[in-house]
Structure formats: C-alpha cells, structure tokens
C-alpha cells in the first residue's frame, strides 16, 4: 500500500488496526498467567477479545481479507493471508467469549468499557454482514428485551453527539475522548486524546476553521425535506446533521449561529457556493466554543440503541416477520424524531411487502445514522456495491459512483 495519498491513508488505517490487534494479543497471551481474581481476569480477557473483534470487523469491511494474527509475534514474523470468512469466524469466537464474560454494566469508575450488550450488538452486526439474520436477531433481541432498564432511546436525540450526556442508555459502545492535548507526534489522531473528526468536517477558512473534508451529499438534505414532523416543522435531525445553503429558511425557529458566525447561511453566498455544497454538522462543538481544533471532548458513539432497533427490524423482516410487525421498531426511531408511524406516513405503502419495506428501511437508516460510520457496511450488506443494478441505484444520488 504505497503511492497515492489515498493509498497512504489506507496504509495508516491498516497499520493502526494491527497495532490495536497486537495490543489485544499481548493481553490475551499474558494475563492468563497473572494470579488474580478469576472473574476480573476473564473480564480483562473479554475486553481484549471484544476490541480485537472490533478491529477485525473493520478490516473485513474495508479489505474483505487480512492477516489473522492471534498471538504476539517477533518483528520478523510474516503472517499468512486469511480469507474474509476465516476472519468472520474469528470475530464470532472473540465476541462469543466476550459476551459470556463481560458484565451487563460497569460502575461509574469504569464507564466506557465494553459490556455484554456491546459484544452482543457487534456480534449481531457481524452476523448481519454475513446474512445470518436468524443468529443476528437472537443477539439483538437480548438488547431489545432490556429496553427501559439497560437501554433505550434518549428523549433528546442530539445528546448522543455532545459531551453533555455521554455513556447514556442509548450508547451501546463509545470511544472516550477529552479535550486535552496530551502531546505526542505523528500524522494522525495518535497525537491527541481529543475527538478530531469535527476539525476535518468543519467548513474551511474563517467560517468553520476546519478542512471541509467528507462533505455531505445534497440528496440526503432533499430526502430529509420530503417529510415533515407531525407538528408541521421540518425534521430537526437535518438541522443537527448537515449545514447547507439557506438552511435557516428551512428552520426559521432555530439558531443560524455556527462557531463564530452569527448567521452561517450568509457565507455560502460569500464564497459562491451552491446548493450542492453541504457540510457535516453532526458532532460539531459550536455549542460551547467559537472555533474548531483537534481536541474535541465529544465521545464517538460506535454503536447506539437506535441502530439496534433499525437492525432488529431488518432481521425480523428478513426472517419472515411481516413488514407491519417489523415497523414497530422503526416507528420508535421515527416517533422520537417527531415523525408519524410508517402506517400513517407518506411511506405507508412500504408495509405492503418485504422488498418495499427493506427499501424504506434503507432510507430510514441513512437519515438516522448518517455520518456515524455504518453506511459502507450497509451498502455492502444490501448488495448495492457488487451489482450493476445496485450501482445504478446509487449513481443518481452520489457522483462518486458514476
């Protein structure tokens, strides 16, 4: 992996995944020999197994193969290639051990560590990527059954994207961040313990003090605007997720302030940007400061309960449950956003068949989970990347597929 800038970035990701795997392997190889409480020992081993599975999950998503390294090795060790299925098999083993030995919850001093629910949610996702929907449903059902005790949707969805209510009942697994620059060197996120994504997503120049990388697509804005809430207003998930030209017109009762800009809508015209220029607003830190930097304190939510609900609905309909019954779990997410149930919406015809329901569910996932890191997995699972019909479906929305 050498040559272009993209290849260099790929190499950095590859290297860092395997650095994480190496550290997990050190724990798994050495902790068993330590004399300590057996429950605590197994919890440590389970945490390492969970994280190793998480890194291998990403490797499978990005490269569909890798090298399966399960023990610490010398620097001159050259691993053999492993197939995608061999890696999935190891992920299943690691997560099965993790869920059997992790607690359902940690006390306040250990919040943020992997839990039984996190292992089950990730295992459910691993099964879904392999189209093992029966097995995935079983894992996700465990979390669904604990709604109201361990898990649930927050009343205010946006609390999932700030530092004001972290490790809450909707957060299944979160990467813990603070805003302190702890030093260090490197060309990547290893130089700080802060959340850096917003620095790269924020608009460039004095308007957003960021780099404008990873822009949103206009089709997503348009899709949000197709349906209003039951109170007649536009979907606030759009306001909190995407910054776009004339966004203030669509949300007249919301603030136009964005970082140091009292009216952020004006600089779209100042810079000659058109309606296709859209920026990712989710996770931004303008609620407490006027400029972005590399040290945001927001936790990054790897998995949250809204994702579990939508995934469970997909598993249900893929295993023979009616679209109407599966819609119950989609409606929980929609109603939290202020929308009507599917049966009362403009999309009510989606309940007529599995195929039509799946297409609507695909859009519901895009709206609720945009920019949270699961879109690539979704597209792969739905077969939209490996068939001409799938590519043709994506082309009108995203020019990168043309």
Question: Where are the predicted features?
Answer:
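Conserved, well-structured interaction surfaces
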Residues: 4-63, 78-86, 95-108, 286-300, ...
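Long, intrinsically disordered, low-complexity segments
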Residues: 14-20, 90, 157-218, 295, ...
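Structural motif corresponding to the intra-repeat A-B loop/turn of tetratricopeptide repeats
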Residues: 59, 130, 317-319
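An aromatic- and glycine-enriched ligand-binding surface/loop that stacks and positions planar moieties
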Residues: 96-99, 113-264, 389-391
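C-terminal substrate/ligand-recognition segments
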Residues: 236-335
């Amino acid at each position: 992996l050498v040559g272009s800038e993209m290849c260099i970035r790929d190499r950095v990701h590859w290297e860092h995944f395997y650095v994480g795997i190496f550290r997990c392997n050190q724990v798994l190889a050495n902790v068993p020999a330590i004399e300590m409480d057996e429950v605590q020992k197994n919890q440590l081993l389970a945490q390492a197994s969970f994280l190793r599975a998480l890194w291998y999950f990403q490797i499978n998503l990005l490269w569909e193969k890798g090298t399966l390294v399960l023990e610490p090795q010398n620097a001159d060790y050259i691993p053999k290639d492993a197939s995608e299925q061999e890696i999935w098999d190891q992920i299943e083993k690691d997560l099965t051990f993790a869920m059997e030995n992790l607690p359902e919850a940690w006390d306040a001093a250990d919040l943020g560590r992997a839990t039984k629910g996190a292992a089950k949610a990730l295992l459910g996702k691993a099964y879904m990527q392999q189209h093992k929907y029966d097995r995935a449903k079983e894992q996700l059902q465990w979390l669904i059954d604990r709604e109201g005790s361990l898990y649930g949707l927050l009343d205010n969805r946006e609390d999932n994207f700030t530092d004001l209510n972290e490790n809450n009942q909707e957060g299944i697994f979160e990467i813990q961040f603070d805003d302190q620059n702890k030093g260090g060197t490197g060309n990547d996120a290893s130089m700080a313990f802060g959340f850096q994504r917003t620095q790269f997503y924020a608009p460039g120049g004095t308007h957003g003090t960021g780099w404008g990388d990873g822009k949103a697509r206009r089709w997503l804005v348009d899709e949000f605007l197709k349906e209003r809430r039951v109170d007649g207003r536009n979907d606030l998930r759009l306001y909190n997720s995407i910054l776009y030209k004339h966004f203030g017109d669509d949300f007249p009762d919301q603030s136009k302030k964005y970082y140091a800009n009292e009216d952020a809508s004006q600089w779209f015209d100042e810079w000659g940007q058109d309606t296709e220029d859209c920026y990712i607003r989710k996770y931004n830190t303008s609620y407490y400061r006027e400029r972005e930097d590399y040290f945001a304190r927001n936790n990054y939510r790897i998995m949250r309960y809204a994702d579990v609900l939508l995934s469970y609905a997909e598993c249900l309909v893929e295993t023979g449950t009616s679209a109407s019954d599966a819609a119950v779990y989609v409606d929980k997410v929609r109603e939290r956003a202020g929308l009507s149930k599917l049966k009362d919406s403009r999309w009510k015809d989606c309940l007529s068949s599995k195929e039509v329901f799946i297409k609507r569910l695909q859009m519901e996932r895009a709206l609720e989970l945009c920019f949270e890191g699961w879109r690539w997995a979704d597209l792969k699972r739905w077969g939209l990347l490996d068939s001409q019909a799938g590519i043709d479906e994506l082309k009108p929305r995203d020019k990168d597929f043309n």
